[in-house]
Regions:
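Aromatic-lined, polymer-binding surfaces characteristic
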Residues: 27, 32-42, 49-51, 56, ...
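Short, hydrophobic/proline-enriched secondary-structure or compact coil segments at domain edges
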Residues: 500-502, 590-594, 682-690
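Extracellular polysaccharide-recognition and catalytic grooves
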Residues: 174-416, 420-427, 562-597, 603-609, ...
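Non-catalytic terminal regions with compositionally biased, polar/charged low complexity
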Residues: 635-646, 651-732
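Short, hydrophobic/aromatic-enriched beta-strand segments in well-ordered soluble domains
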Residues: 548-550, 601-621, 645-656
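Short, ordered beta-strand-loop transition motifs
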Residues: 137, 378-381, 487-498, 518-526, ...
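Catalytic and substrate-binding regions of extracellular carbohydrate-active enzymes
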Residues: 337-570, 643, 649, 653-656
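Bacterial Sec-dependent N-terminal signal peptides
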Residues: 1-23
Length: 732
């Protein structure tokens, strides 16, 4: 009922109560009062001062050069592409400096550049480097960049509009902004109404233009879609792209990118129509969107690189500066302040001013990342992501991400039930991310490379199970979008963090279940490890490949292997064609251990094997004539001809290597025993033992996983009785 009431109220507000942009200037996210306060307070506030100086350096630099607005020619990374990007950023910083200092040299620069664009834009055809079957722009090869240009430029215009002569203002608004709004919202109708980050940027840019130009129609189309019926537009984006927990369906990399237009446009709505309560929408969804996004980072503050992600992006990015500032302003969440302080800058906005004041009143603290289960899907029923985190002896943490989320639309990868693992600063089990060199013109104009589809999206490029060398859902987004994995159970305690999920639709006749447990044993609470149990079940025989992607250098194995002297690809399709077979071995029945060194620490994977198990070491680079793929390695466990199989692996950090002292400690795996001691239709029991420690049993329920279910099982002379979906206990 709340949703219906909000929609009705919104319609009424837009048709009857929307403010005219002529009533008050500026109308977006930096008011005249806030600009005056920033000017007066920055000398005594280090965060405001550093933020002001950051923009001042950029603005002063552009004043040294003439305004240049080139005819669009280049793809991403090329001169004209980058120049148009710099131009909107330059205008934005110059407009900020004018608002704070009152120096008309800055406003004059913005006005001159906007006039230059007003002369150019009406004459532009679609971009000459546009890509077939991809929404094109005029200034840029893709329409997305056009919306980003408007997003920043309309903010700059908002701050200097009253300084520009009426005649020039009319030309800028008619020839440039209204022309561009028409192109983005009418000529690019499909993108404008798409539930996707491209659509988010488009509606945010057009909506803010509507506020600045005093055009209620623009605002309403932006918020409720072109037909003004609420089936598309900003509110629908909030409804469909985020789960109730604030998880964005395309994953954290694109959540980082999209959070800027979501938060800034929401702030513009709140400034112009506070009665709409946009920041209370869907139970404070935008607050959860920011806090969940921050949690989706590792200890290097990098976003977990699932789906189409450029690795190394951190929460120090410009998008998060704005998003965290606005989130603090609106929700007064003190947990955000350590991130803002660490960033060292605030946005020069109303929100940035409020946030800087709050930071100055608090002591320095570190950002607290916690174990958590994050639901996916607009109703929270499309699987999710589990973050398992435990402190370790080195004063950092062992972090695991277990992905059992939905497809993630076109940017999603086929990595159902995939995992990532980090140990402090070290990436232990990695994800390739996206095959793209963003804005590097030499690499296909900075676009996604063809290897993104042929390798990076494929299941074998992830830490998950692959059947018959075929990717999940045959690598088809349309098929993958029909179903999501099912969460079976989860339990977060001090000594164990455990999550189990099932995927029954990725293959026609293979059911997959993965249970991931991070365990800190009583005898060694500061040395957590990962117990990974991956079950494959089918009525027909298959080849099952469980892949572990590892950085670092192989140190030793417990099994013999043969190094290939002549390199060949692991297969012909679905990403296998890009993997060189570097070495292989047959370990026989028992357990196989592989140890590698990454940074200054050793890591081992110990896995149960039998006579049919084959082990492979692979490396990217096959059938890659242009060296588009980074050189990365994998350890692949293959089980051939099996209908059902249980992969049981224990992944442990151990020891250290000090190149300065030339010392090595505990380079060998501590695992002495790993066994599957019981298995039937209802239960599965694994035993494991570390050197000089007692053995433990992990019992899992395969059928009833209700937390109140009672279970009893006899294992040898030991009777196991427990309540819930699992039991972890000492072996007697």
């Amino acid at each position: 009922m709340q949703f219906v009431n909000f929609t009705v109220a919104l319609f009424t507000a837009f048709t009857m109560q929307a403010r005219s942009a002529q009533q008050e200037l500026p109308v977006l996210i930096l008011s005249a009062d806030a600009a005056r306060d920033i000017k007066s307070e920055k000398s005594t506030d280090a965060l405001l001062e550093s933020s002001f100086q950051y923009s001042r350096r950029k603005a002063d630099e552009v004043l040294k050069h003439p305004v240049t607005v080139p005819l669009p020619e280049d793809a991403g990374g090329g001169y004209t592409h980058e120049k148009h990007k710099r131009n909107y950023a330059d205008m934005y910083h110059a407009a900020l400096l004018f608002s704070i200092t009152g120096d008309k040299a800055y406003s004059g620069f913005v006005g001159e550049m906007l006039l230059a664009y007003a002369r150019l834009y009406p004459k532009l055809p679609l971009h000459p480097m546009r890509k077939e079957n991809h929404p094109a722009g005029k200034l840029f090869w893709q329409g997305l960049n056009e919306a980003v240009w408007l997003f920043y430029s309309i903010q700059a215009y908002d701050l200097v509009k009253h300084e520009i002569r009426r005649k020039d203002r009319d030309r800028i608004e008619k020839e440039l902004f209204r022309n561009m709004v028409r192109f983005i919202s009418v000529d690019s109708y499909e993108t404008f109404n798409k539930i996707h980050n491209h659509g988010t940027w488009a509606v945010a840019a057009v909506g803010m233009a509507g506020y600045v130009l005093g055009d209620k129609d623009m605002v309403e189309r932006a918020v409720r879609g072109s037909e003004k019926d609420g089936k598309t537009g900003f509110l629908k984006q909030l409804d469909e792209l985020f789960s109730p927990d604030g998880y964005y369906s395309e994953g954290p990399y694109y959540q980082r990118y999209a959070i800027l237009p979501f938060m800034v446009f929401a702030e513009a709505i709140a400034q112009n129509q506070p009665e709409l309560g946009i920041f209370e929408y869907r139970d404070n969804l935008l607050h959860k969107a920011v806090t969940t996004l921050l949690q989706l980072t590792n200890q290097n503050n990098e976003f977990y690189p699932i789906n189409d992600a450029i690795k190394d992006k951190t929460y120090f990015s410009e998008e998060l500066i704005f998003a965290t500032n606005i989130a603090y302003e609106r929700y007064k969440d003190a947990d955000l302040l350590p991130v803002i302080r660490q960033t060292g800058r605030v946005s020069l906005t109303n929100a940035g001013l409020i946030t800087a004041r709050a930071v100055s009143r608090t002591e320095g603290e570190t950002y607290n990342r916690i174990p958590m289960l994050i639901k996916d899907g607009s109703r929270g029923d499309q699987g999710g992501v589990a973050l398992l985190r435990m402190p370790n002896a080195s004063g950092t943490r062992l972090d695991a991400l277990f992905k059992f989320a939905s497809q993630g639309m076109g940017h999603g990868h086929f990595d159902r039930l995939g995992i990532l693992l980090y140990d402090g600063d070290n990436e232990v089990l990695s994800d390739y991310g996206a095959a793209r060199f963003l804005n590097v013109e030499a690499k296909d104009g900075g676009r996604y490379l063809k290897e993104n589809k042929s390798y990076a999206k494929q299941s074998i490029a992830h830490n998950t199970l692959v059947a018959d060398e075929t990717s999940h859902y045959q690598g088809k987004v349309s098929e993958g979008s029909k179903n999501a994995p099912e969460l079976l159970f989860s339990d977060f305690r001090e000594d164990i963090l455990i999550v189990s999920a099932r995927e029954n639709n990725a293959y026609k006749d293979v059911n997959m279940t993965r249970t991931v447990a991070m365990i800190a044993m009583e005898e060694a609470p500061d040395y957590p490890f990962l117990l990974d149990i991956f079950e494959a079940d089918s009525d027909t025989p298959h080849q099952y490949d469980l892949n572990f992607r590892y950085p670092g250098q192989l140190m030793q194995t417990s099994f013999p292997y043969q190094r290939d002297q002549t390199l060949s690809a692991m297969g012909k399709n679905n990403g296998y064609q890009h993997l060189f077979k570097m070495a292989s071995g047959k370990p026989g029945k028992g357990q196989a251990t592989f140890t590698w060194l990454e940074g200054k620490k050793f890591y081992s994977i110990t896995t149960l094997t039998d006579e049919d198990t084959e082990l492979f070491f692979t490396q990217t680079g096959a059938h890659d004539p242009h060296f588009n793929l980074r050189t990365e390695k994998s350890y692949l466990i293959r089980q051939s001809g099996a209908k059902t199989h249980v992969f049981v692996s224990l992944i442990e950090p151990h020891g250290s290597f000090d190149p300065q002292l030339e010392t090595v400690q505990n380079p060998d795996s501590e695992v002495e025993e790993l066994r599957l001691v019981f298995e039937d239709e209802d239960y599965l029991v694994v035993s494991f033992r570390f050197r000089n420690r007692p053995a433990y049993l992990m019992a899992l329920c395969r059928g009833e996983t209700d937390e109140d279910g009672l279970h009893k099982l006899q294992i040898g002379e030991q009777t196991l009785s427990w309540k819930g979906a699992y039991l972890l206990t000492r072996k007697q």
